[in-house]
Curated annotation (Swiss-Prot):
One Pfam family recorded for the sequence: TLD
Molecular function (Gene Ontology), one example: ATPase inhibitor activity
InterPro entries from the UniProt entry: TLDc_dom
Annotated localization: Mitochondrion; Cytoplasm; Nucleus
Assigned protein family: Belongs to the OXR1 family.
Name of the molecule in the record: Oxidation resistance protein 1
GO cellular component: cytosol; mitochondrion; nucleus; proton-transporting V-type ATPase complex
Gene Ontology biological process terms from the UniProt entry: meiotic cell cycle; regulation of cellular pH
Primary location class: mitochondrion
PANTHER family, per database record: MUSTARD, ISOFORM V (PTHR23354:SF62), NUCLEOLAR PROTEIN 7/ESTROGEN RECEPTOR COACTIVATOR-RELATED (PTHR23354)
Keywords tagged on the record: Cytoplasm, Meiosis, Mitochondrion, Nucleus
Reported function: May be involved in protection from oxidative damage. Has a role in meiosis.
Amino acid sequence: MFNFTRQYSVKDGLITDELASHIVENLPARYASAETWKRIYSLQHDGASLQTMYLACEKEKARSGHPKGACILAVRDTDGDVFGVFIPDYLIPAPHYFGSEETFLWKYFPPKKYVHYPFVGNSNFVAYCTKSFLAFGGGNGRYSLWLDGSLEYAYSSRTPAFENNPLSYRGCPDQRIQIVDIELWVLE
């Protein structure tokens, strides 16, 4: 069994021990050894606001004193599927794409199936944070994962950046995904 320290109780959270063990298998070595996974934002506890999530990142960046932070974003849809992204950066609005080849997408759905989509480098569109939306992957006019500013819905399509299938298991490309919960974690 995978062992890591959680700063918050997450028995009602999205990242279970089993899901965490799958994610760790794909993390770069320097992040896989992180001793603490700290949940800094939860839609259920902090409200449905992209700005609140960005503010949590800014506060964590100031607290840690590190210019970069390793983040895991987890999203649950109305079908109960959980999907998200690992990115070795804080999610803070920027006027351009950012991120690195260490970024990856993942999805986890019943019966406990985990799928990993590494960055394949066919575009430089890794992450894009604006005040009105948050997006990962890009190309051909689509995003691998796009979340609206109210965090009520998302879209997921195949892009050259990750060559992923839609992240919502029951979703189709360009179909609106209704969001039930979102969590943002930082690894320390």
